[in-house]
Curated annotation (Swiss-Prot):
Species classification: Bacteria, Pseudomonadati, Pseudomonadota, Gammaproteobacteria, Pasteurellales
Protein name: Bifunctional protein PyrR
InterPro entries, A to Z: PRibTrfase_dom (IPR000836), PRTase-like (IPR029057), PyrR (IPR023050), PyrR_bifunctional (IPR050137)
GO MF, one annotated term: uracil phosphoribosyltransferase activity
Catalyzed reactions: UMP + diphosphate = 5-phospho-alpha-D-ribose 1-diphosphate + uracil
The protein's role, per its UniProt record: Regulates the transcription of the pyrimidine nucleotide (pyr) operon in response to exogenous pyrimidines. Also displays a weak uracil phosphoribosyltransferase activity which is not physiologically significant.
Motif stretch (PRPP-binding): 100-112
Keyword check for Transferase: yes
The keyword Magnesium is assigned to this record: no
GO terms for biological process, alphabetical: regulation of DNA-templated transcription
């Protein structure tokens, strides 16, 4: 069973609200780097970056971060017969002494964010990392919390939250899937 909990209009308003919150918190946008966790987190990061640039006229740098080899559940994520291929990030941008705005689609156990923080070290030592999450569904296994949340959606562990983006799904929406 599927229920749409965020439609396209709400999706874009959420992107706009998160972007405004980032602008309000950071008077100097020159020290920001936006890092999107591949796959859907990277597309959301791009939308946030575009909105911030549109509102402020800035040119905030960004990268897409592949965390495949930093995950602690790799044996479950890939079929045994297939080895993952490391693609790294879209470009190399130093985050040394910068504030990183780390973006992902769903916050669940916190393990993806832990892996992203490990991967981020390869790009330098950030002065600060702030977390943007489009949907926080609870059920944390690690002590991780978001600085900017699009929507809190309490779920059962058996439910799934699916953030759909134009690049991968042909639309912008969020669905709650239950058995």
């Amino acid at each position: 069973m599927e229920k749409i909990i965020i439609d396209e209009d709400q999706f874009m308003r959420t992107i706009s609200r998160i972007s405004h919150e980032i602008i309000e918190k950071h008077k100097n946008l020159n020290d920001l780097v936006i890092v999107g966790i591949k796959r859907r987190g990277a597309e959301i990061a791009e939308l946030v970056k575009r909105k911030i640039n549109e509102l402020t006229g800035s040119r905030i740098p960004s990268i897409d971060l592949d965390i495949t080899f930093y995950r602690d559940d790799l044996e479950y994520a890939e079929p045994n017969s297939q080895s993952p291929v490391y693609n790294g990030s879209s470009d190399f941008i130093s985050v040394q002494n910068k504030t990183v705005i780390l973006v992902d689609d769903v916050l669940f156990t916190g393990r993806t964010i832990r892996a992203a923080l490990d991967a981020l070290v390869d790009f330098g030592r950030a002065s600060k990392v702030e977390l943007v999450i489009f949907v926080d569904r609870g059920h944390r296994e690690l002590p991780i919390r978001a600085d900017y949340v699009g929507k809190n959606v309490p779920t059962s562990r058996s439910e799934k939250v699916q953030v759909r983006t134009m690049k991968f799904d042909g639309c912008y929406e969020v669905a709650l899937l239950s058995k």
